[in-house]
Structure formats: structure tokens, C-alpha cells
């Protein structure tokens, strides 16, 4: 689930054991929200594992993003197709662990509010979808980030993440750098003449991260 910082901690600690030395971490979309939540929860311990983190096109306000993708074009196209991949996986999990969640409610779900109420929230111990989104969003915790430098990159025309919900300078701590270009979409950021290329994004993020090695 999108706030599973314990899984991020498990992965990073094992990477650190396998490859001792300075480490940088990048999370994309939901993975970026997870990475930021980990950095927040780990506090000072995070700085002993990574030198810096970056979150790209990450939904740090899960409530606002869920509401955005549950309406209009996003719901008709993206949500419908994404749920078509998620529901079979959830139902397969119920075959392994009967009674874990309500199978019929999962089958009926047509948006993420219904799906997270039926599956994600109950299996991870949340009261409901709104409780899950609120507790797993990185945005409310960004102001407390002081131990690890963090880059939070979001395009203001991301079709899934409304610009109105992006963090402002006053909502983040001194360790957080905000990049919010007007264009870039969701993990797009094309550059150059048509058809363009996407080399600028990893180069820019890499250059920012290298400053902290």
C-alpha cells in the first residue's frame, strides 16, 4: 500500500548491507510517497542509510489525488483500467486467505474509494479509505523533515495530482526542496522538439542528488 514505509526500510537496509557506501534513493509516483514516509518515520536513522531522497510525480496528498482520479476522464479511462488489474490480484489473495476482505464488495468497486474501503483499508488495519489516505499521505509530515535532504518534484499539469494540493514552501521543512514546473505531466517531463526526449528528468534529478554525496 502507498504508505508502507516498513517495506521501504526493509529494502534499503538490505541494499546497504549488500553494497556498503553512500546511497541515494528515488521513488516514482506512489513509490515516492512511500519513500518520503519512510524518511519521515526513520528520522535520524534515515541519514545513516541514505544521503538524500527524491520523489518524482508522487501523490503526497492521497485524499486529493484519490478524489481527482475518481471523477471525469480519469475515472472513465485510468481508474477503470487500473482497477481491472487490481481486482483480480485482490480476489486471488482472498483465495489464499479467505475472510480477509469482502470479495463481493471488491468485485462491485468502480472507483478507488470503493476499492480501498473494500480491500486496501481493512487488510492493512485502517478504519476506511479516508483513514488510509490521511495516515499514509506524506504531505502533512514534510514540515518535520530535517535529517535527510529530500527533493519533491511535481509538474503542475499532472493529470492525476491537482496543482492545488501540492505542498508549498511554508508546508515543508528545511531539508525539503520543491520543484514544481508548469509542465511535465505524470512522470513525463519531455524536452526538445517533437517527438522530444525524456533524458532531462533523470539528469536533473541525478545532478541534485549528487550534490549530497
Predicted feature residues:
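Short, conserved loop/helix-junction motifs that constitute active-site signature segments
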Residues: 47-48, 142-146, 169-173
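Short, hydrophobic alpha-helical segments
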Residues: 16, 205, 209-213
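Catalytic histidine-centered segment of alpha/beta-hydrolase-like enzymes
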Residues: 184-198
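Short beta-strand/loop motif that positions the catalytic acidic residue
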Residues: 145-146, 151-154, 158
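Conserved loop-alpha-helix segment in the C-terminal half of the alpha/beta-hydrolase fold
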Residues: 156-177
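Alpha/beta-hydrolase-fold enzymes
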Residues: 19, 24-123
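Alpha/beta-hydrolase active-site loop
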Residues: 1-18, 37
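Active-site nucleophile elbow and catalytic-triad environment of alpha/beta-hydrolase enzymes
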Residues: 118-142
Amino acid at each position: 500500500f502507498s504508505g508502507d514505509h516498513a517495506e521501504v526500510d526493509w529494502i534499503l537496509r538490505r541494499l546497504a548491507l549488500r553494497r556498503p557506501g553512500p546511497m541515494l534513493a528515488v521513488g516514482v509516483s506512489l513509490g515516492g510517497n512511500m519513500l518520503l514516509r519512510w524518511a519521515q518515520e526513520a528520522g535520524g536513522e534515515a541519514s545513516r542509510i541514505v544521503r538524500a531522497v527524491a520523489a518524482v510525480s508522487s501523490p503526497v496528498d492521497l485524499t486529493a489525488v484519490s478524489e481527482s482520479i475518481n471523477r471525469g476522464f480519469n475515472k472513465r479511462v485510468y481508474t477503470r483500467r487500473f482497477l481491472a488489474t487490481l481486482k483480480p490480484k485482490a480476489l486471488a489473495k482472498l483465495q489464499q486467505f479467505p475472510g480477509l476482505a469482502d470479495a463481493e464488495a471488491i468485485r462491485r468497486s468502480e472507483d478507488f474509494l470503493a476499492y480501498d474501503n473494500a480491500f486496501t483499508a481493512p487488510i492493512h488495519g485502517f478504519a476506511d479509505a479516508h483513514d488510509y489516505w490521511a495516515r499514509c499521505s506524506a504531505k502533512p509530515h514534510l514540515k518535520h523533515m530535517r535529517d535527510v535532504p529530500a527533493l519533491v518534484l511535481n509538474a503542475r499539469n499532472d493529470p492525476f495530482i491537482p496543482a492545488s494540493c501540492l505542498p508549498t514552501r511554508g508546508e515543508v521543512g528545511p531539508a525539503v526542496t520543491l520543484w514544481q514546473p508548469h509542465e511535465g505531466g505524470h512522470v513525463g517531463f519531455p524536452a526538445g522538439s517533437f517527438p522530444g526526449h525524456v533524458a532531462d528528468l533523470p539528469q536533473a534529478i541525478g545532478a541534485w542528488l549528487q550534490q549530497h554525496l
